[in-house]
Amino acid sequence: MSIMQASCIALVSSLTLTVIFLPLLIKFMHSHHEGQEIRDEGPKWHQKKSGTPTMGGTIFVIAAVISVIWVTAWQHSLNKVVWILVISLLGYGIIGFLDDGIKLYYKRNLGLRAWQKLALQIIIAVVIVLIASSDHFNFGLYIPFAGVVHSVALFVIFIIFWLVGFSNAVNLSDGLDGLATGLSVVAYGTYAYIAFKQKNFAILAFCMSVIGGLIAFFIFNHKPAKIFMGDAGSLALGGGLATVSIMLNRPWSLLLVGIVFVCETASVIMQVISFQTTGKRIFKMTPIHHHFEMLGWSEWKVDIVFWIVGLVGSILYLAIWG
């Protein structure tokens, strides 16, 4: 069986598990009157989404983990790379699960405090570094225009920054029905293609497993969303993406492949700096998808335009660097 055939089985497995169990989670949350609390600072028309079931990411994360483990084990390819990817996805997913759980329990929009979330994110990143370093891991980091720099300290700092940064970047992008889901399908699809070209079955199977779960999740997450992925999904997706880019030895690719995630994060940083220094806001509201909403764009229009931008970023990367 070819690596693509086995990876497609992983995709179908993850998709099937998500389709089966996600409706059960939605039904459970409705029966217990559990749902997302919408922040007051967001667009006023988002308040009608209050009470929508959340934590849907828990299902597709578990589905992806189960699928990639059993398919790689079946193909005798369950190696350290698979475990690093699984720990990344599951580890950041657990942080998000705790965050979502606190929000639901206390019926508020605030979950883990910022320092608590950051500390846990750093711990997961350090665990990944420790696991990778136990197998003669290459700590060379390519710096654009400077070449490869061999520094363990620099590489460890970079991995922590990359994983924490992109887990939060995807989290910031999860503000509209289906937005982060579609963007993640494009990004993971791009890395699946790269992994296939490199004949890296572990990463290919992982990406396809995540894609399968996301495709199934989108059925319930497109506007009007029947369930949100919550931090359990968005933090996991971002952590997984960052780890995949590093394991493929192409970390900088994420600046183009994940260009929308980068722009969402940059808009928040720019807004804060501008307001703190000049008292003026650059955007009507951040993250930037809300800015376009405030300009009168519908959610579907924002989704489609942002998905296209994400796709163009991925195509540009593949066209230039393959």
Swiss-Prot record:
Question: Which CDD domains does the annotation name?
Answer: GT_MraY
What PROSITE patterns does the annotation carry? Answer: MRAY_2
Question: Which chemical reaction does it catalyze?
Answer: UDP-N-acetyl-alpha-D-muramoyl-L-alanyl-gamma-D-glutamyl-L-lysyl-D-alanyl-D-alanine + di-trans,octa-cis-undecaprenyl phosphate = Mur2Ac(oyl-L-Ala-gamma-D-Glu-L-Lys-D-Ala-D-Ala)-di-trans,octa-cis-undecaprenyl diphosphate + UMP
Q: How does it sit in the membrane?
A: Multi-pass membrane protein
Its chief place of residence is: membrane
Its required cofactor(s), as named, are: Mg(2+)
- Class of this enzyme: transferase
Q: In which pathway does it act?
A: Cell wall biogenesis; peptidoglycan biosynthesis
Name the family the entry cites: Belongs to the glycosyltransferase 4 family. MraY subfamily.
What is the recorded function of this protein according to its Swiss-Prot or TrEMBL entry? Catalyzes the initial step of the lipid cycle reactions in the biosynthesis of the cell wall peptidoglycan: transfers peptidoglycan precursor phospho-MurNAc-pentapeptide from UDP-MurNAc-pentapeptide onto the lipid carrier undecaprenyl phosphate, yielding undecaprenyl-pyrophosphoryl-MurNAc-pentapeptide, known as lipid I.
Protein name, as recorded: Phospho-N-acetylmuramoyl-pentapeptide-transferase
> Which species does this protein come from?
Lactobacillus helveticus (strain DPC 4571)
Q: What is the lineage of its organism?
A: Bacteria, Bacillati, Bacillota, Bacilli, Lactobacillales
